[in-house]
Amino acid sequence: MLIQILTIHPAIVAPVFRESILGRACEAGILDLRVVNIRDFALSKHQQTDDYPYGGGAGLLMKPEPVFGAVRWAAGRAPAGARPPRVILMDPQGRRFDQRYAEELAREDHLILICGRYEGFDERIRALATDEISIGDYVLMGGEVAALVVVEAVTRLIPGVLGDLESSVAESHTSGLLEGPQYTRPAEFEGMRVPEILTSGNHGAIARWRREQALRRTFERRPDLLQSADLTPEERRLVEAWRTRQS
């Protein structure tokens, strides 16, 4: 997969692509992560990428010309035989990003993520986008951090990026439930012991315990997720029993 992040601040993004799992996946040829400097496509000699809004108002807006130029250039770098890229505008007005959206994007060949700065975009820039994504109901100083969230969530789903594919499947939200409690050595620490079931060696019982713990944690912390979670009839009865005791 080719992922290009378009930004006026490449130094925010580039170091992340060289580190840890992302860096190793790039070295192995599993991922191709690139940063495109929008300033390189500015038309003025001072590489201006912002200007005052028509009609007045506070702040500055991203100019359309550099962004159009950067996106068109990035789209021309698509891998041979790749489908047209998904062009994603990082925008607090966009669709809320979640695990299912990450799974959808992980099936693509080529992603282009546009990071804004200043007070926002010239409205005409939206014509470039196939998607507009928000990572939450708050405002950041720019789209770079949000774009990196998308990159992390998407790339970890690509085969070979994580050493253990099962770990990506078992994580919170992938199953529709939050992940239950986990423990490592020592078996006892400051009076807190690891649950005996986890040291029993009974893998079937351990799997059932983990599923129930995940269900309980989701019920306690994110009950909204249970509406769309894939639960068995027995699990739904268990949730109803918890609700009854809670009321």
Swiss-Prot record:
InterPro entries: Alpha/beta_knot_MTases, tRNA_m1G_MeTrfase_C_sf, tRNA_m1G_MeTrfase_TrmD, tRNA_m1G_MTases_N, tRNA_MeTrfase_TRMD/TRM10. Its main location: cytoplasm. GO terms for biological process: tRNA N1-guanine methylation. S-adenosyl-L-methionine binds at G116, I135, G136, D137, Y138, V139, L140. The keyword Transport does not apply. It catalyses: guanosine(37) in tRNA + S-adenosyl-L-methionine = N(1)-methylguanosine(37) in tRNA + S-adenosyl-L-homocysteine + H(+). SUPFAM superfamilies: alpha/beta knot. Keywords: Cytoplasm, Methyltransferase, S-adenosyl-L-methionine, Transferase, tRNA processing. Its EC number is 2.1.1.228. GO terms for molecular function: tRNA (guanine(37)-N1)-methyltransferase activity. It is found in: Cytoplasm. One of its GO terms (cellular component) is cytosol. Pfam families: tRNA_m1G_MT. Specifically methylates guanosine-37 in various tRNAs. Homodimer. Belongs to the RNA methyltransferase TrmD family. This is tRNA (guanine-N(1)-)-methyltransferase. The gene is trmD.
